[in-house]
Design a protein with these regions (language model features):
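Generic hydrophobic, helix-prone segments enriched in Leu/Val/Ile
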Residues: 2, 143, 212-214, 317, ...
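Bacterial N-terminal signal peptides
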Residues: 10-17
Length: 685
């Protein structure tokens, strides 16, 4: 009998070990409207830790006071087999946004996502350049999982049998409301680690949630003023003379140009890289950079971080690199201080000290076929998947610190990022080239604290060329990337004048763009964002399918898809931009509540309604809120220098009174962090 008791006790203990222990989460407030909870034992290596975030505390004071969201008490976590699962409740008709840089969808409820840094492959499945594990609810809260692992997210997919909202079984033979995706009342997230750190953000609005996230991550980047001008990336094997001639041609043709990007041929070896100048194409790098600066044009350098055996730092870097190579180049273990210092010193010595203004850091995302495998090891002890998830953060942080210590701002490009990168001076790009999907990515970037450029590379027609250019001037970085095509703004002579008009418009609007990035930094408001964050926006007006025949209570995902607006967005405080794509003659635009006016003519266009417009080839639809005040400067070819005065033209739209806060600082240094900046109130009564 005693032996039987022992067996029973042992059996009970085994069952307890097999069954995951579920528990509510204790929440600790870390910033106003932001709470942190812990399940199990989270790994020390995390996204926010790698990003080295310092919250922008002053910005929180300008947000509404809030209390812990009620759903906090319903969030549960459990640990089984060394993995952590989290369950966050959902309400009917609640919509989800975010989960990183998606290219084809804005609404994420109903998705199954594997959040994994990778080059985007044409499907919104979680594998993307910035798989940020942060989402925003239409109910006015947000959730961030601070883990550097590959996460699996069931964003309202999967129904528990013990749920009080469990769907009812239906007979597919006879019931037309049967669906293959029954109603799910929760987001479930699997973290492959024995613990997880979860952040909960209160609103009350979705925009407030986004702002709190951005402020927690240090506030948005404030680029140098020249970074908001126009940039051209040259062909791969251009020489110093080729670059100078191209800059001269921009000047002669009257096209603006603030910085030029040099592609792989500037290096003595690339793929993998030496980080050293090619002596035949650039015999005098310092003189070349100096000459370009004298023309008012800065230099940005392409690179990837993989070290060639021919690089002078190869031997020193070898012991602090990973076990596997990329294109036969070693991979610096940037999680280790020594590898970072070796790389930083090399970049500083070869580039920054002679006046190079920034970097384009390529191929830190994937593809799997060439990047290190998940079996790779690194001297720091960081797992290969964690390094994959954070390598984009490391290259941004490392290069940004190079300029920060010189009190010099930079603005560049990167192909991978993740949570915590909001304050880094980098814009994401890729090798994909769908114009409509590029706009959807621009829309989604505002949910995740990253920036994206719908860059122009090449086109098969003058129409496509112009349409892409019209879009890119209303984005974080106005750029032609001609590394392979050799295209220039005037490549299609039949639309050269229209291209020039939009290029000059970009320059004229620099006071507006600069002020909007200041709001991004100080207040966390993304300068380019989805309509879903705009007050008074009603996606019902964007319905593209009849819903009367659908049982939306059982299939809310159908409702979400039918109301998705993914081809128009807000640019700054006042502008609604609706791009046109090749072959389009007309399009619909959904206007939020309030009077809206045509950006070009000032004419009234509508209020809280869906309109159909036929703008012609010379224009894309851009609309302005009633009462808006927009600051313009005179058209010019280069951004103003520090201390340079410019004449402003102030435009007021509509009939309502309005105001605008115009931001100013030296445009080049970090002195604004010490209070060296000003806001000027522009008021129309």
């Amino acid at each position: 009998m005693e032996r039987m008791k022992k067996i029973l006790i042992a059996g009970a203990m085994t069952l307890l070990m097999l069954c995951p222990a579920k528990a509510q989460i204790a929440w600790q407030q870390v910033e106003p409207g932001v709470w942190k909870g812990v399940v199990g034992t989270p790994e020390e290596y995390s996204l926010l830790g790698v990003a080295g975030v310092t919250p922008q505390k002053e910005g929180f004071a300008r947000l509404p006071e809030v209390t812990l969201p009620q759903l906090a008490n319903e969030i549960v976590g459990s640990i089984q087999d060394g993995k952590t699962s989290l369950r966050i409740p959902l309400q009917r008709k609640e919509q989800l946004y975010g989960f990183g840089l998606n290219f084809q969808t804005v609404h994420q409820r109903g998705k199954i996502l594997n959040l994994h840094v990778d080059h985007y492959g044409g499907r919104d499945n979680g594998r993307t350049h910035a798989p940020v594990p942060f989402y925003i609810s239409s109910s006015g809260y947000g959730v961030l999982i601070n883990s550097a692992r590959y996460l699996t997210v069931y964003a309202g997919s999967g129904a528990r049998k013990d749920s009080p909202n469990a769907p009812v079984a239906k007979d597919r033979n006879l019931d037309k409301t049967w669906t293959s995706a029954p109603y799910s009342d929760a987001v479930s997230i699997l973290v492959p680690a024995p613990g997880a750190e979860i952040y909960l953000f209160a609103g009350p609005t979705p925009m407030d949630v986004v702002r709190r996230y951005n402020l927690l991550c240090g506030g948005g980047t404030l680029p140098p003023r020249w970074g908001l001008g126009f940039t051209q990336r040259t062909k791969k094997l251009y020489t110093a003379e080729d670059v100078k001639n191209e800059a001269d041609e921009f000047e002669q043709r009257g096209f603006p140009l603030d910085f030029i990007g040099l592609e792989p041929g500037w290096q003595s070896k690339a793929y993998p890289c030496t980080f050293e100048w090619d002596a035949t194409r650039y015999p005098d790098p310092a003189g070349f950079v100096k000459d370009m600066l004298a023309k008012g044009v800065r230099i940005n350098l392409w690179t990837n971080p993989y070290v060639s055996p021919d690089s002078k730092i190869y031997k020193e870097m070898y012991p602090v690199s990973g076990s596997h190579t990329v294109w036969c180049g070693i991979v610096p273990d940037l999680a280790g201080e020594k590898a970072r210092k070796i790389w930083m010193d090399k970049l500083e010595q070869e580039h920054v000290n002679i006046g190079v203004s920034g970097y384009k850091v390529d191929e830190v995302d994937g593809y799997d076929r060439y990047v290190w495998p998940d079996v790779a090891t690194f001297p720091s002890g960081i797992a290969a998947e964690q390094m994959r998830q954070t390598y984009g953060l490391w290259v941004q942080r490392t290069t940004a610190e190079l300029y920060k210590k010189r009190n010099q701002r930079t603005f560049g490009l990167v192909r991978a990022s993740n949570a915590g990168a909001t304050s880094f001076p980098y814009v994401i790009y890729n090798d994909y080239y769908s114009h409509p999907d590029f706009i959807t990515a621009l829309i989604n970037s505002g949910f995740s604290g990253v920036l994206w450029t719908p860059e122009v590379r090449s086109s098969s027609s003058s129409e496509d060329w112009l349409r892409r250019f019209q879009s890119v001037v209303f984005s974080p970085m106005a750029m032609i990337n001609a590394w392979a095509s050799g295209t220039k703004p005037w490549t299609f002579p039949e639309v050269e004048n229209q291209i020039k008009e939009y290029a000059m418009l970009r320059m004229q609007m620099m006071p507006y763009w600069y002020s909007e990035f200041a709001r991004y930094h100080f207040d966390g408001i993304p300068p380019f964002r989805a309509m879903n964050l705009e007050p008074g926006f009603n996606p019902e007006q964007g319905t593209t399918a009849k819903l009367s025949d659908a049982n939306l209570e059982d299939n809310p995902y159908l409702e979400a898809v039918s109301k998705e607006i993914k081809d128009q967005y807000m640019a700054g405080e006042y502008l609604l931009v609706a791009p046109m794509f090749k072959g389009q003659k007309e399009r619909t635009v959904v206007l939020p509540k309030g009077d809206w006016y045509d950006f070009y003519t000032g004419k009234y266009v509508g209020n809280g309604e869906k309109i159909t417009v036929t703008p012609g080839l010379d224009r894309i639809p851009v609309y302005v809120k009633d009462g808006a005040i927009l600051p313009f400067m005179e058209a010019r070819l280069h951004a103003p220098k520090a201390g340079e005065k410019v004449n402003l033209e102030i435009r007021h739209y509509g009939k309502a009174d309005g105001s605008y806060r115009l931001y100013d600082d030296d445009g080049e240094t970090f002195d604004y962090e010490k209070g060296a900046y000003s806001w000027l109130s522009l008021i129309h009564i």
